[in-house]
Curated annotation (Swiss-Prot):
Gene3D superfamilies: Hexapeptide repeat proteins, Tetrahydrodipicolinate-N-succinyltransferase, N-terminal domain. It is an enzyme of class 2 (transferase). This is 2,3,4,5-tetrahydropyridine-2,6-dicarboxylate N-succinyltransferase. The keyword Hydrolase does not apply. Homotrimer. Its EC number is 2.3.1.117.
């Protein structure tokens, strides 16, 4: 692993001079190995280590190098013809492979090579970009978008039209993270490396970026960049200092209780394949 990282870090420093015509075979092999391992989940962009999310920026650099070094190719998919450097993730998969992974992929769901999809997931017609990580038992609902390198936990439900922000550049920026057992309501947007902690419920139409105030009405605390575990969040507003206008915020109205869980619970029958 350290050797792979050294190869990528060194090559990235001179990425402007690297192309598919002059790439060193050692670098090329390293980039392709990393893309394969992101695709199969043995590497991931960000992971929780000792309670803290750690982003492996060198893996993002490997993806950027892949854009420099991989050739565009014709992609025939869904009755159309496309032209890109990265194939569709499920190109070449057969019945047995889908069945063994216990996946349901509903057309025209689009998943790019380099995104990891864990077992027992349901992917409705949606878009999942490269470098993303979708963990076990999650449902990505219709027209949801999971951006590059976003990390989605176990048993998450991304409702219809949800947008989860992606990030490749700037390199030092962290991905958006949705932890285990979260529910993200329809048409909500979580972007800019925000972390939604375990078990949180986001109502429909909530927009959260790094500068969004997340107001806890019980305590009066204001959070930025993270939604505390178990929070139930709705859209709201707060008055300006002079009281002349109200500006948008997200409001924590309570913590998750049994009533909330029943409202957002995904019927296991929908997952039974």
């Amino acid at each position: 692993m350290n050797q792979l990282r050294k190869i990528i870090e060194s090559a990235f420093e001179k990425k402007e001079y690297i192309s598919n015509n002059n790439i060193d075979s050692t670098v090329n092999n390293a980039v392709r190995e990393i893309m394969d391992r992101l695709d199969n989940g043995t590497l991931r962009i960000s992971e929780k280590i000792n309670g803290t999310w750690i982003t492996h920026q060198w893996l993002k650099k490997a993806i950027m190098l892949a854009f420099h070094t991989m050739d565009n190719q014709l992609i025939t998919w869904g009755g159309g013809v496309f032209f890109d450097k990265f194939p569709m993730k499920f190109s070449g998969w057969d019945h047995t492979r889908f069945e063994n992974k216990k996946l349901r992929i509903i057309p025209p769901a689009t998943v790019r090579y380099g995104a990891y999809i864990a077992d027992n997931t349901v992917i409705m017609p949606s878009y999942i970009n490269l470098g993303a990580y979708i963990d076990v038992g999650t449902m990505i609902d219709t027209w949801a978008t999971v951006g590059s390198c976003a990390q989605i936990g176990k048993y998450v439900h991304l409702s219809g039209g949800v947008g989860i922000g992606g990030v490749l550049e700037p390199i030092q920026t962290n991905p958006t993270i949705i932890e285990d057992n979260c529910f993200i309501g329809s048409r909500s947007e979580i972007v800019e490396g925000v972390i939604v902690e375990k078990g949180a419920v986001i109502s429909m139409g909530v927009f959260i970026g790094q500068s969004t105030k997340i107001y806890d009405r019980a305590s009066g605390n204001i959070y930025y960049g993270r939604v505390p575990a178990g929070s139930v969040v709705i859209p709201g507003s707060l008055p300006s200092k002079d009281g002349r206008v109200n500006t948008y915020c997200a409001v924590i109205v309570k913590t998750v209780d049994s009533k909330t869980k029943n409202k957002v619970k995904i019927n296991n029958l929908l997952r039974d394949i």
